[in-house]
Amino acid sequence: MKSWVLGAAGIAGAGVALAVNSRDAGAAASQAWPAFVLVAGLLLVGLVAAEDGLFAAAGAALRRACPNSLVLFCGMAALIMVVSAVLNLDTAVAFLTPVAVSAGGRSTDAGLEEGLEEGRPNVGAALLPACILLSNAGSLLLPGSNLTNLIVVTHARISGGSFASRMFLPWIAVGLVTAGVVAVLSRDSLRAKRDGSPTQLGGESASAEESPGRPRLGVGAVGIGAAVAAMLLLGSPSLVVLAVGVAAVCARMFGARMLGVRAPGGSVKVARVAQVLNLPVLVGLMGLATAVGTLGRLWSGPSELLGHLDPLGTAVAAAVSTVLINNLPAASLLSARAVTHPLALLIGLDVGPNLFVSGSLAWVLWLSSARACGVDPGLRRALRIGVVAAPLGTLAGVAALMLTA
């Protein structure tokens, strides 16, 4: 019900913007739509990859290979960063949160859920906040890693490869700082012994654990490769990535003979596709982005403020704005006019949401994914860590960005 309310609000907002100034509303819509089309394609690719067991198998392999909780945490942190960069932070949060719960397993004292509720040391207490915080931090590398990236750089026509070359060092710096803060503030959990038993979950993750380390290398893997290639090579990859996602889902639904790849494990259900895409939310957010983008074109205040700030000040202003109005409206508002330091703006927009739940919808997705596994993810604990990690990560990211200039 709430998703339909958001959808209606977004459509109404876009309608008001169109009535007030059709030219600016059209410009705002043209800036916003590629981001939402691309994320829809990436969510579809991520869904097929999850159905193929790729994420669950990666988590199971890490659990088997890592000798202790700290090494497991480092491996999961790297996995979260890479999936966020390649398949978008929303995909990472949706499909890796169950993997983090499963990989956390049971401590020698209690099961994961009991350990989290009773405050007992458990590696899951570090993996769960890491999932949301590192998903945000890991969304700096490619234009498609975060909706805000595409909104800000849409008119720049910069290729994914060029964007990645400029943002690689900031991505590494923010990721290392964020992971380090989570590890330090969760050090008791990372000292806990593991018993080698994964937490059993319902649905796809549980089934993947039945044959850990043996993912179905078919349509999902092909889709990931094609989506990554499009984002790296094309200046405007949105429609191509959407086509890849639709083709991947159709291949799983109707068979993959036409593509020359195998699609074992059954077809993707239409209801599951609708659940993952959540079109009312995507349409609503695009409408709101259009409305706020129109406001940014009519009101010169945000542009004038950013014009007087250095890169660090720009990043800080962006981070604060994500807490106040959410990162997507903030991206539309602050980039409606030319920005002096667009990449610094992105660091604030991507890392700032770690400060508070209002920063991005990924927080809501993280909470719902963890609770669907029957686990309370510990929101207050994650926020306490995020309040420390976000400022330090922003500072590290801007410093690394200035080194690449």
Name each model feature, range by range.
Residues 80, 84-90, 94-134, 147-166, ...:
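Membrane-interfacial helix-loop connectors
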Residues 8, 36-37, 70-78, 92, ...:
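Hydrophobic alpha-helical transmembrane segments
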Residues 8-20, 40-46, 80-81, 135-138, ...:
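Hydrophobic core segments of alpha-helical transmembrane domains in multi-pass membrane transport
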Residues 30, 47, 51-52, 56-59, ...:
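Transmembrane helical segments that form the transport core of multi-pass membrane transport proteins
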Residues 1-3, 24-35, 160-170, 210-214, ...:
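Interfacial loop-to-helix junctions that mark the boundaries of transmembrane helices
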Residues 31-43, 163-180, 342-357:
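Alpha-helical transmembrane segments
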